[in-house]
Amino acid sequence: MSTAAATSVAPAPKPKGNLPIFLVLVLLALGLPFLGKGGIIAGVVIGCAVLGVPLFGIIGLLTLAAFVVYLGADQPNEFPLIERSRGLGDQVTLLAVPLFIMSGAVMGRGEISSRLIDFARACIGWIPGGLAMSAVFACVFFAAISGSSPATVVAIGAMMAPTLVKAGYGERFTHGLLTSAGSLGILIPPSIPMILYPIVNQTAVIQVETLFASGFGPGGVMAVIFAASCYAIGVRKNRQEGKPLGPDLYRGLLALLFPVVFYPFLDGGLGMLEVGVKLAVYLVVIEKTTDFSFRQVLRSAGRGFWALVFPVAILGGIYGGIYIAVEAAAFSVVYAVLVEVFIHRALTMRDVLGVFRETGVFLGSLLVIMVAALSFEEFLEARDVPHMLVQWIEGMNLEPWQFLLLVNGVLLLVGMAMDILSAMFVFVPLLAPIANALGIDPIHFGIIFIVNLEIGYLTPPVGLNLFVASTLFERPLGHMIKSVAPFILLMLGGLAMVTYWPDLSVGLGRHIMGDDEAPVVEVPATGGALEELPDETEETGAEDDVPDGVQSLEEMMRELEMGEEGGDLDDDAGDLDGEETDAEDDGRVLSLEEMMEAAGVE
């Protein structure tokens, strides 16, 4: 499947099946231009949607119409399309996008995904619901390699869906789980939206590597929530099959003990030897009392060695300072091709060239959208829209938590109508300055933005994963919407945790990167950032011999001008540029103006 689908929009409503809706849209498109300039622009957008114009065309025409209507067509130099196109060439980070897409597409067609599934089943298949859990963690692992949500759905869903249904899991649960878990691809680094967010957010200097690290916590929370639902479904399935509840609870308790083995080591409380002993005891217990097989784990790990090493090599190299995100993306392409073509022998070079062609098509459509969206951002800045929004929000006297609640509601609605990349280009420039004015960390806001639009992958009418899964599983769109509905509710709970627990993302990300400093704010949204500067009458902090110990700027200037403290100054103090001053003649202290005049300062 071509990745270019990521930038398309839902088909225009067809008159035959949706005639009332179609007629309403046509009337709106024809009538809105009579309502003024804003109506003209809205009419252009709705008219394009009725005609089925692709997304890049809608955004491009929206931008062009906005500039023509508000600035006039006689000033072509004011149109920033060409300048924005040239400016994208200066964004080195942008090169990582097609490279990560290439590597993900190569692995999706190869055998890496199947080997990851085998390893996950060997590790956690013995837990109630373990087969479904293995699908979740295979999605997490594959997402950490490919960075693409639709690619994760296709790669893992194609192999796990028949297996889960055959094992007794309901079809609706199976399809909903695989479609929803696949959306973790945009939250687990490396992630395409995480690469683009620092480019779009012009209010702060954000490192892509720090944003990557900040995605681990929220991604892990979502994965654990899905795994817990799998455990509950697994226990219920076993009870329906007449299996006693006792063993399920025992196995679940053993599974919960696994993090206890490793957390003290990660927290610096235990060394490798202590952890090794605890892990050995843990493995012996579960192997003797459950269906777990350590030998099977080793066998599947050996078979999937190159797949397991991949994320370690990519992310470890980034966080270890070996290479930056762009270099890691280039390395991922070389690694994927070498493994799938020459080690696994699952692909030929002709297959790889086909993947590269598809990636080129996707990148071309993406760049058109980026140029149009960034140009529209230029229009919004020219009309001072972000500043007006900031003033409007500040006038509402919202607390940060209230603003984040409002943002979540807006973005959930946006996710239903726009794909994630387009939503980022349109709404980040509008909302980021407001978040900055309220003191919300730019990285935290970026993670919240991405989690919201991750849910948008599952919501109609343009939820991309719904269309991908509908095609993959050969089921109607209505079936897929019902399948993902319970998982959307679970993800909303995870969204609340991410929103109101900043340390889950920001704290963990900076801990991983060893950076305790917040991103540098470049463009303050309002004058509020300047209010924090010290007043010019504040103390300078330099101690001297005056009675108060510390002099303010005003006091020092007054002393220079009026000679409060001192009488005569040394002759050397009166020398400027090696010349004698008039201070020697009359024995007085020079004023500040006289000193500047003597120094030749205008």
Predicted feature locations:
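Alpha-helical transmembrane segments of multi-pass membrane transport proteins
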Residues: 2-602
